[in-house]
Structures are given as structure tokens and as C-alpha cells.
Amino acid sequence: MGFYNCRFLSRRLSVEPCRIGSAAKSYQQRSIYHFGAALTNAPSGRETPDKLRSDLHSALEMVDEIYDTNSTVEDIGNKEKGGRQKYTEEMDKAINLLKTNIKKEYRHDKYLERTKVGTYPGRRTYPGRRTYPARRTYPASRTYSDSNSYTFRINVQKIRHALVRYNQDGVQKHNQKPPRIGHGLTRVLYQPLSLQKLRDNRSRMYNFDPAVENINPEYLEKKSEKDVNTDSSGEGQSKPIFITPHKDESLLKVAKEHRKKYISSSSSMTSVLSQLHYLLSNFRRLNIIDSSISKNFPQKNCNYSESAYFPSAVILRKKRNGICSIDSDRSLDREIVLSVLGHYLEDFLTEKSLKNSSKSENYHYSSIDEFIVRSQLDAYDPNLPGTGVFDLKTRAVSAIRYDLSHVESNNNQTGYEIDKVYGEFESLEREYFELIRSALLKYSLQARIGKMDGIFVAYHNISKMFGFQYLPLDELDYIIHSSYNSKFDSLLKEKNDITKGIYGEEDYILHYDRDDRKIACLVANREFKMSMNLFSNILKHVEQLLNSSNTKWEKCKIMLKTEVEEKRSKSGRFFNEPVLNIVALPLSPEYEDKSLLVKDTSNEQLTEELLNLRSYNENLLEEHLNSLVGFKVNVKHFYHHHPNTTHLPDFALKKNDILDTESRKYISDMMKRDWYKDIPSTQTPNFFHASDVSTWEVNSTFTDINDKQILRKLYFKYLDVKLNALKNQVITRQEPDMSKKDEIMNRIKSLQARNDHRDNGSNKRYSNFGPTRLQTKLRAYAKKGALRRKLLERSNKFHI
């Protein structure tokens, strides 16, 4: 079959043309993109058949999946002969699917027009029709509604996510494998999700190397960064101190080599991508019903913690060669002992070898859309799927995370310990539940960016290690992307009942049962690509707004927050819709985003520092108020049944003469029924079949906010949220200064008020500056743990 021109789908599909010609792409890839002409020259007034459209999408998805699977660090050309043959066969299979559907099944030869290989018509004219240019510029499929807003299609088909090499001094550096996990912890990797204790309480026997139990206090001391080179090569140390993206010369070189516009690190990107997840998923809830979390915690309606919804703040900086860097805004954060401890614990838990003692490569560089994103390599295991690389996280217990300043004021000591697997407090389960609500989304995004298999978590209380857990990425996807609302649930049950009635229980289980986990993984991957493409468009629009206002800038602060906006339908009904608000403030060249220092600082001094920080940001905003820009982002979802899921069963065909006409018509109507038609386009996207995910497309609308006072209000709103969060991290909430008698009286009065239904929530904490109820509980459990530890040590001395 000959080649066809490269106009990629019809304008009706709103997919940007894809230029093929790179030598890195195989014959099969170039061929399948040329077949995209199938819909370009459709006769006027004729709609593209849905089945043809969906099968073309399906074939392209197959190519994407095959390409992504085979385009990691190693080049296709460097693979062994058997690997290349398998790759070629898979590509041929995708092409043959497309040929069959277009040429044989649908008889749509008239939609195809043969052209020479590599021919890209500049412009084509049809009698009585508009003339369209062969190529379009950013962004794809813009539709302008007025001077302040436009809509475009988020283009997933063109996005490639692959690991790239770093060429240093003209020599291509091969990615060196990170170290293996040590201390006998390898078996944790092969028992995913299991919460595994370091030591058994009953027998006092260790399940892993006892050497990992006690944490060296030296790990709490931050090492000097003055002798560290400003690149990510990490020469001369087993693990490099974190280099912010805008200071990383190696990262800049990779972006220049691969002609990318933006550079960042996975940790700097996750806060933004989290906000985009809330936008694209319409605040999808977490699903822990089928997880290892017991009924000690609420199974339904599990949402993220309050801190997970905090606004994202990043700094966009202009670099050389038209490249921009994206860094987290550290000015609204603090130096935290857990970050320093985590860095050295991650190094401690891995094996030491001569090969890894002086690493020349400590990162994966991921090419995604217009980004090069750097991911730290923590550990590797050859038996894990994919790259075999996984992230290593150390997780402090709840008593530390919810009351960090109190623990720091106590010389980084807490008696709170983990002594069981399950339970509301002092358990691994409690820590896993808190991780799911506050950090799981961030962990999953970091793993996906770096093409890692999963996350290894070590639970500790700064002084001691208590347990371990391995979380594969597909399990994280299931928790984050598999929940659905009651309306979809009722539709799914109705559809399943009908499908069981048509095919029978056995065939339903074997062939038609919904694969929840596969759907969640496909949704996660597609949403991630959409998020990266959307963020690229957001950054370009910020630059465009700043440039159009004649603002000279080298760096700017961007604050993003997805919120719920109440809207009214044409029928008069009110409904909620997610909207992403974006505010960008140009910064002076001398601006530095330094973290707040809290060591050896009193509450009074910290309070003054926070007030100064608020005042500084006020002055900064007033100074650049005229240059302040912003806009809001809305999205609408479009998807439908994939044709592979709507085929009539053989027994319902007329030629088989099994059913009467009425029964055949009933089955035909049921198979053709559009189960998606009543689902609003702004609702959380859910899918009945895994193949339907490939039809998911999103329209995004940018609406400029020209009112400076609205922008000012949004800026201070998000600033105050960040400052309040910072205050809760650094200000120690002291126990109320009252006598035992007064404490008893207050407690009894509060109990009486609750019983008389007169509780107005005032008893959540003893005073405005006292500990919260949860902090009070955790401090009590810490005292209980300290007493238990003393009794155990005394008992051990007695037996000796």
C-alpha cells in the first residue's frame, strides 16, 4: 500500500499535523502517520464515520505505546536482533489494523489520496470550500470567542515521553544504573503494598538487618553546599546535593541539545501537575476500598488532605538560547530537617560498591512535550519491570508531620513509635493512610516523570526505623484514578446487567468484565500527557501576556490554584465546575527565593519574620501591580465508545438465524446505545471500557483576567494560604498555661456543651495558640511510647 499525505486526521478532529521525517523514527512510524490522510479529503457535507475515526485513533495509540515501550534509554538500533524483530512485528500489526479497517471493512478508498513519500502540500484548494494551510502554529485548534479568551484542543497524539541521554563534551554518556537496595530489603520489592515491620514485637526478632533500626544523629546536620559544582554530574560523592534546575548547567545542555524550551526537576513540577490533576479529573476522590487500608479509616469519600490542595508557586526564569527554567518558589517554604534526613537515609539504605562510589550520572532526563525534566535516581533492581529504577522515600510518623515545630523544639525527639501493622494510631496503617491523602499524588507523578517502576517507603520517627513498603506505580494509579460517582456507578451496573444477559455469566467474566486497574493506568498516562501539554500552553500564554504589556522581565512568580466555580445551566440548574486560576508577577533581577531559617529561633522571632515576609510580598506586588497578569482555565471532556466494544455477537447476526427479528433489533439497540450521552462534559471522566480511554480528548479555554484588583485579590488569597501553612510549620503550639483544676473544668464544660448540642467547634483547640485536638492526641501517644520504651529497656537490662 502506498504512502499518503501527512495531514494528520481531519480538522474536525482538531489534531495538529505531525511532521514526519526524523531519521530516528522507523519506517513503520512514518507509514502510519502518512495513513492519517484518510479523513483529510472527505467529500463535502459528509461526516467522518465514528468507527473509522476511532480505529484510526486506536492504531495511533498502538504506535504510541509501542514507541514509548521501546524508546527508553537504549536506542532501537542498539537492541539485539530479536528485539528489533519484535518491535517491527508490533509496528506492522498496528499498520495492518489501520489498512484493514480503511480498505476492507469500511470501503473508504475515496477518503485516501496517494502522494509521493515525504510530500507535504503547502496548500490545497477544493471547489466551493475554504482553503486551509497545511500546517498550523501553537496552539493546536484555537477557537477565539472574544478578545480575552480562546479554546484549543489538548493534543495527546503528538506528545512523546522518553528518556534521553546527556552528551558531555561531545561524548554520549550512558545512564549508569543506580545502586541496589541493601540490608536485606530486596524482598520488600517483591511483596508490593504489604506493610512490613522491621522487628516483630512478640519474638523481638528482626525481619531485616538490625543495622537500619537506629538512625545516626549526624544525618540531621546539613552539609555545606559551597564546594558543590552547579551541575548534576555528582562527581566525587555517592549522592549529589540537590541542585535547583535554574542552576543546573547539565540540564540546560540537555535541553539545548534536544531543542526543548523548558527545563525543570520532577520535584519542582509536581505541585503544578497536582493542580492540573484536580482540574482534569474534577477533584476525583481517592479509592482505598480495595486497598490494604482497613476499616479503622473511612473507606468511602476519601479525599486529599488540606495541604495537598495548597496553591502551587513556581519561578519561571529566562535562561540562555531561549530556554526557561521552572523552580519551586522557596520563599514561601522553610528549611526542614526531614529533607536533610531523607537525603542521607536514602543513601544509607542502598548498597555501597566501588562502581557506585563515584557516580558520573545520577539522573534520568525525560523528554516530555516541550520539557526536559530531571529525575533523581535512587535505587535499581533488575527484577523489576521497565527500567528497574524506583524512587526511595523516607516518611516520618504523623506525630512529627503534624507537629514538626514541637518535635524540633524537643531536640528532634519524639516518643511516638510504630508498634503494630494495623490500628488507628501507632501503626504502619495510619502512616500509609496519611501518605495516601497527602503525598501519594506527588509520589506517583515523580515516578511517572522518571519512568520508574514505583516507590519504596521507609517509615521512621527521626531516631528509629520501623517498617517498609513498596508501592508500584500501577497500584498508585488505581488509588488515584479509579473512583467514580454514583451516577456513573448506576450506569455501569445497568450496562453490566444487560451485558451479562446478552452474553451469559461465563462469557461476561471471561471477556467483558470491566478492567478497573487497566483503565486507571491508561487514564493516568493520558492525563499526564494532557497535563504536560496544557502546562506548556499555560507558560507560553504567561510569556505572551507579559510581552504584550511591554513588560521587561527575566523571572516571574506564577501561582496556580484549581478551585470550584458554581455555574448555572440553560435549564436553570446550578452545578460545580473546576477552574484553574493563574496569576503571574514579574520579579526584579535581584530577587532571591530563600527558604525561611527556623533553627534556634523563638516563636516571637518567627512571628516577626512571617510578618516581614508578608510585608515584603505586599511591597513587591504594589511595585509591579501594573505588570501583574493572570487568566483562568476551564476544560471540557469528549469521549465515546470505541468501536471494538460495540460489535454485535455472532448469534445476533441475521445469517446465523438464531434469533428472531425483534430480538436481533433489541441486541443491536443495546450494543449501539450511547452510555456516555447523559454525562456532562465537565464531570470527572470515567470509562466503561479500557479501549474508550483512547477516544478521550479535552478542550481547554483560557480566559484573561484584565481587572488588576481581581488579580491582586487572588494573589493575596493564595499568598495567605501559603503563609498560614508556613506558620503552622514553624510556630510551636504550647500547652495551655492553666492549673489542673481549670483544665478539668474546661474539659467537663466542653463535654456538657457537646451533649447539649451547643458545641460550636470552639473546643477544637484549647486556645488560638494551643495545640489542635489531633496534636494533643499525638503528643499523648508520644508520651505513651516513651514510657513503653523505658519499660522495655529496663526489662532487657533485668534479663541481662
From Swiss-Prot:
GO terms for biological process: mitochondrial RNA 5'-end processing; mitochondrial RNA metabolic process. GO terms for cellular component: mitochondrial envelope; mitochondrion. The keyword Mitochondrion applies. Residues 219-240 are annotated as: Disordered. Its main location: mitochondrion. It is found in: Mitochondrion. Keywords: Mitochondrion. Residues 219-229 have a biased composition (Basic and acidic residues). The keyword Mitochondrion applies. InterPro entries: Pet127 (IPR013943). It comes from the Eukaryota. It holds the Pfam family Pet127. Could be a component of the mitochondrial translation system with a role in promoting accuracy of translational initiation. Present with 1730 molecules/cell in log phase SD medium. Belongs to the PET127 family. This is Putative mitochondrial translation system component PET127. It comes from Saccharomyces cerevisiae (strain ATCC 204508 / S288c) (Baker's yeast). The lineage of its organism: Eukaryota, Fungi, Dikarya, Ascomycota, Saccharomycotina.
